[in-house]
């Protein structure tokens, strides 16, 4: 049987990435051009800057991904691309490149939801058994997703306000930490003690919804009040207390979801899945189901995860037309 090579594109935010997946599970290349340095001075991603960077490097990323995979353009079987959610300008760059490549070579175009990509990155660890539950935690999303089979996703819980990664970055900005702040807060948290009493919103409520805005506001108020009074606060203890509150919320809701949806596998994915504190809590507290977390290199935004997610769409022959457009607010319930 002839090998299948999927060329995948990911440009939903501030990483330009192109990958090649051989058959169902052999990731031959996963080229990522990061823009973090360009956005650091702004304390967050500037959409116009992100789009410009994508345009500048995407051709080189395609060439590098093919070369690293050891294949030529003629070997590619299909093209997969993120079409949402994300920044509309950034998404359009990847869509334009993917559609151009697919059209020029007469290849099918596979539309992929960015968050489905995060979830299916777990396929790189081992074949997934369905049904399963997924906790997706990133800079833009915090969701609990029930997956009855590959490609069939249902959101069963989500944040009412800030995403968990967004809360990390906003708290980090207040403390003067470098963007993105998640990794540094995690490192500092492991050096401090949980001594500040921060709220755990809705932690005892019988639902699967998250809320981090109250926690974020409480942190900012404590920090600014101390500054106004000339008081000194331990950065390490602040980070430890903030992270403890975040993890308490995530763990409480995940446990409730596992009670409501009896599955054998929990996937934890997204940029925040790289958090050491979260991984420690999962290992200590979720012991009655298999927990699968993608490797660190596949936790952040990357085209490898888009390639993995595209396999189920390929199997269903869920191909897009040339009119496929960016959907910045795309949800699982509105996938093509």
Swiss-Prot record:
Q: Which Pfam families match?
A: TsaD
User: Keywords of this protein's UniProt record, alphabetized?
Assistant: Acyltransferase, Cytoplasm, Iron, Metal-binding, Transferase, tRNA processing
Q: Which cofactor does it need?
A: Fe(2+)
Q: Which InterPro entries match?
A: ATPase_NBD, Gcp-like_dom, KAE1/TsaD, Peptidase_M22_CS, TsaD
Chief localization class?
A: cytoplasm
EC assignment: the record states 2.3.1.234
Where in the cell? Cytoplasm
Question: One GO biological process from the UniProt record?
Answer: tRNA threonylcarbamoyladenosine modification
Superkingdom of the source species: Bacteria
What positions does the entry give for substrate binding? Answer: 136-140, 169, 182, 186, 275
Q: Give me the comment on cofactor binding.
A: Binds 1 Fe(2+) ion per subunit.
Tell me one GO molecular function of this protein.
Answer: N(6)-L-threonylcarbamoyladenine synthase activity
**Entries under SUPFAM superfamilies matching the protein:** Actin-like ATPase domain (SSF53067)
User: Which enzyme type, at the first EC level?
Assistant: transferase
Q: Which reaction does it catalyse?
A: L-threonylcarbamoyladenylate + adenosine(37) in tRNA = N(6)-L-threonylcarbamoyladenosine(37) in tRNA + AMP + H(+)
Binding of Fe cation, residues:
114, 118, 301
Annotated GO CC locations: cytoplasm
Say what the protein does.
Answer: Required for the formation of a threonylcarbamoyl group on adenosine at position 37 (t(6)A37) in tRNAs that read codons beginning with adenine. Is involved in the transfer of the threonylcarbamoyl moiety of threonylcarbamoyl-AMP (TC-AMP) to the N6 group of A37, together with TsaE and TsaB. TsaD likely plays a direct catalytic role in this reaction.
Q: Which family does it belong to?
A: Belongs to the KAE1 / TsaD family.
Q: Which PANTHER family match?
A: TRNA N6-ADENOSINE THREONYLCARBAMOYLTRANSFERASE, TRNA N6-ADENOSINE THREONYLCARBAMOYLTRANSFERASE, MITOCHONDRIAL
- The name of this protein is tRNA N6-adenosine threonylcarbamoyltransferase
Annotated source species: Streptococcus pneumoniae (strain Taiwan19F-14)
């Amino acid at each position: 049987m002839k090998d299948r090579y999927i060329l995948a594109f990911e440009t939903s935010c501030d990483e330009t990435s192109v990958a090649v997946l051989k058959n169902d599970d052999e990731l031959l290349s996963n080229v990522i051009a990061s823009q973090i340095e360009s956005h650091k001075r702004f304390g967050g991603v500037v959409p116009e800057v992100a789009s410009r960077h994508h345009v500048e490097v995407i051709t080189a990323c395609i060439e590098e991904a093919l070369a690293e995979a050891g294949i030529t353009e003629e070997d590619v079987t299909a093209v997969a691309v993120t079409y949402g959610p994300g920044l509309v300008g950034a998404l359009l760059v990847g869509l334009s490149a993917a559609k151009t490549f697919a059209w020029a070579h007469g290849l099918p175009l596979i539309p992929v939801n960015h968050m489905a990509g995060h979830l299916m990155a777990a396929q790189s660890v081992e074949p997934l058994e369905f049904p399963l539950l997924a906790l997706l935690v990133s800079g833009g999303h915090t969701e609990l997703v029930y997956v009855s089979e590959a490609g069939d996703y249902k959101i069963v819980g989500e944040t009412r306000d800030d995403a968990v990664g967004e809360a990390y970055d906003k708290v980090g900005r207040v403390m003067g930490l470098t963007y993105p702040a998640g990794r540094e807060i995690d490192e500092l948290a492991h050096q401090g003690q949980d001594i500040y009493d921060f709220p755990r919103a809705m932690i005892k409520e019988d639902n699967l919804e998250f809320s981090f805005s109250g926690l974020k506001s409480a942190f900012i108020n404590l920090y600014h009040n101390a500054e106004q009074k000339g008081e000194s606060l331990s950065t390490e203890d602040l980070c430890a207390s903030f992270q403890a509150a975040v993890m308490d919320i995530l763990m409480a809701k995940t446990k409730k979801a596992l009670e409501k949806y009896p599955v054998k596998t929990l996937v934890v994915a997204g940029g925040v899945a790289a958090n050491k504190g979260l991984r420690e809590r999962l290992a200590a507290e979720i012991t009655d189901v298999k927990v699968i977390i993608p490797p660190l290199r596949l936790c952040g935004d990357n085209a490898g995860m888009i390639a993995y997610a595209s396999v189920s769409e390929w199997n269903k022959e869920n191909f897009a037309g040339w009119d496929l457009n960016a959907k910045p607010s795309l949800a699982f319930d509105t996938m093509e």
